[in-house]
Design a protein with these regions (language model features):
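N-terminal Sec-pathway targeting helices
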Residues: 1-14, 20
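Alpha-helical, hydrophobic structural elements that either
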Residues: 13, 19-429
Length: 429
């Protein structure tokens, strides 16, 4: 009898442990942001056509909330439910880490749909992730009034993708490749270099988010060494199917410039990276590549007026602003709109000035690049670029420290980019 009672007690204890373990492993994964937003990991989908897993609304399961995402290739999509204050929409991206924490890649929001007021389901397509690992780590990088912040909490996500892939042959560094008469030599490629810029609060110095890819080039055109070409943009891919785009900037440390850097790269232990690099000139332009405009009027306005100007140009079917000037540059028709001076809440409330351009056809679709070469105000002071937005042939630029500006003088160029591809293995910092 005592044995029966003992075994009954043991069975109850084991059952309780099993239930606790089940609840532990199946409890929702939640990250809370500093503004009170609650993010819940819903699930992942893998393939060409994506709809979110079932989510519960008022205790009932629901799936058809309108959020869908399609792709031509098999892709991995992460679904997240965001609970937030009504009319206060969260702004964040995901950072994807391997288990060994050797590197990471970021993913921005691709689509979303409202479940109910204050609750949205969001889709993030992972164009780069550690495909060879059974699990990956996701952290949240949020943007708000407190600046850029990285979450301490994380989502642990199983990898539903295949883990076998081909290997690419690599060329040794230095590696020289060409586009037309331009020969470019990749002289340096280092993954995991310390970034000149910190990614924000909650990100330690050694976090992969604070690492970058350091690289450098030599140029020859028609057999002569050249110094007026610069790398602009790079697409980094690997044989596993990862692909990520980055903008290339100078590598500045301790007031010195040493080549170039970009973020993010891929995982450095992969046997090969393929880099498709866009190069642009900074001088040596012909007359038909240059447009100089003087006395562009500056109108007083607000930050919302700047946003409205962008929206008006982007939505060509809506009401369009009147252009101050227009012409054709290198086969591209360009319209320049009056500038707006405003109090910039994103720059400490100081005075900034913004102007917009509309180019048709889209220069980037033609393998070309539109670049502001020089801008000054009516008093001859050169202005400091604070930021820019572009896409679909629409361009908008912001300049800080723009007090008492009445007019702008600017020069833009439109010229053909060159594209060079390297297949190499990076060294590690």
């Amino acid at each position: 009898m005592k044995k029966i009672i003992l075994w009954t007690i043991v069975s109850v204890v084991i059952a309780g442990i099993a239930v606790d373990a089940y609840l532990w492993f199946h409890k929702p994964q939640i990250i809370k942001l500093s503004d009170g937003t609650k993010l819940t990991f819903v699930g992942v989908t893998y393939g060409k056509h994506h709809v979110p897993p079932k989510i519960k609304i008022a205790g009932r399961s629901s799936r058809d909330n309108g959020a869908r995402l399609d792709s031509t290739n098999d892709t991995l999509v992460v679904w997240i439910e965001a609970e937030h204050k009504p009319n206060q929409y969260p702004n964040f991206e995901l950072a994807v880490y391997d288990k060994a924490n050797t590197a990471c890649a970021t993913s921005s929001l691709r689509t979303q749909s409202q479940v109910k007021n204050g609750v949205d389901v969001m889709a993030f397509r992972l164009d780069a992730f550690p495909r060879w690992d059974g699990k990956m780590i996701l952290r949240v990088i949020s943007y708000g009034q407190r600046g850029q912040q990285a979450s301490k909490e994380q989502f642990v996500v199983s990898n539903p993708a295949g883990r076998s892939y081909a290997k690419w042959a690599t060329d040794p560094i230095p590696d020289t490749q060409s586009d037309g008469d331009l020969s470019v030599t990749l002289t340096k490629l280092v993954a995991g270099a310390q970034s000149p810029y910190n990614r924000g609060n909650g990100v330690t110095r050694n976090d992969p988010l604070n690492k970058c890819v350091q690289l450098d080039f030599d140029f020859q055109q028609k057999g002569q060494s050249m110094t007026h070409w610069r790398p602009v943009r790079v697409v980094t891919s690997d044989a596993a199917g990862n692909s990520i785009q980055g903008w290339i900037n100078g590598y500045y440390q301790n007031g010195q410039t040493s080549g170039y850097q970009y973020r993010e790269g891929l995982w450095p232990d992969e046997p090969a990276w393929k880099l498709r690099v866009e190069f642009s000139r900074i001088s040596g332009f012909s007359d038909d590549e240059v447009w100089a405009v003087t006395n562009v009027p500056v109108q007083p306005g607000t930050q919302q007026d700047v946003q409205n100007a962008w929206n008006s140009n982007w939505n060509s079917s809506g009401k369009s602003n009147s252009a101050f000037a227009e012409t054709t540059v290198n086969g591209i028709h360009v319209k320049l709109f009056p500038a707006i001076q405003y109090q910039d809440q994103n720059n400490g409330g100081g005075q900034s000035v913004s102007y917009s351009l509309k180019a048709d056809p889209d220069p980037e679709a033609q393998g070309m690049r539109l670049t502001p070469l020089k801008i000054s105000d009516d008093q001859g002071r050169e202005l400091q670029n604070r930021g820019s937005s572009w896409g679909g042939g629409n361009y908008q630029y912001q300049y800080s420290n723009a007090r008492n500006v009445k007019a702008l003088n600017l020069t833009i160029v439109i010229h053909k980019s060159r594209y060079v591809e390297f297949t190499v293995k990076p060294s590690k910092q």
